[in-house]
């Protein structure tokens, strides 16, 4: 995906979760929308260089959106919702390799009693009507996308960056789908150029770490994609290793 021209600025503070005060090069102080629900640990240091996109809607209350921040470890896209767009493009281009060969891709698919997957991949070779996950079958793969911005150690990214009951529930639902005969995958989309491998954030959310391990043990596929990121574009360019999927594995 490509970015329109971004405005450079200096971060003053991030607050109330969705707001960020930023100073522009001309000295103006603006309030930007911060499209990230996480803790943004290491990605919200005052004084950091940031990049903002202008709002397309002139009636929007906040005229700017915080897109990226420069950290000592690398450039980070903090607009976490863009991970879905990046992954959709990657899937269409054949990443991850083990998810190649699907006939159709559909976003935001409901399954089970009240669950929703980011994507469903249909590996059936013949069109069979609307792509609706009525019951689990191996030819229908649910895909859950998780944006990774937290770097815990040199090159090691971790998810989540705050306790997430919702993310834990997602893993349990994917595990249930697989146990019923379906196929499911979680893709960690790494939006930080300094990260070269990913692990569950055991010390932050042990419940999620355990849910991920249990899901993996029962057949949920786990992948990570690293991006090439600049102020002009962001594209998933490579698969990264996922560690910590077995007890005691944190390499």
Placement of each model-derived feature along the sequence:
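Active-site metal-binding core of divalent-cation-utilizing nuclease and nuclease-like domains
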Residues: 71-81, 92-149, 169-172, 227-236
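Short alpha-helix capping/helix-loop boundary micro-motifs
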Residues: 30-40
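Short, charged beta-turn/beta-strand-edge "cap" motif at the junction between a beta-strand
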Residues: 13, 54-59
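Short aromatic-glycine-enriched beta-strand elements
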Residues: 16-21
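Short nucleic-acid-contacting surface segments enriched for D/E, G, S/T with interspersed K/R
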Residues: 38-51
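Short, Lys/Arg- and Gly-enriched loop/turn segments at beta-strand edges
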Residues: 57-68
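Domain-level recognition of nuclease-like catalytic cores that cleave nucleotide substrates
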Residues: 192-251
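Nucleic-acid nuclease catalytic cores
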Residues: 155-165, 169-204, 226
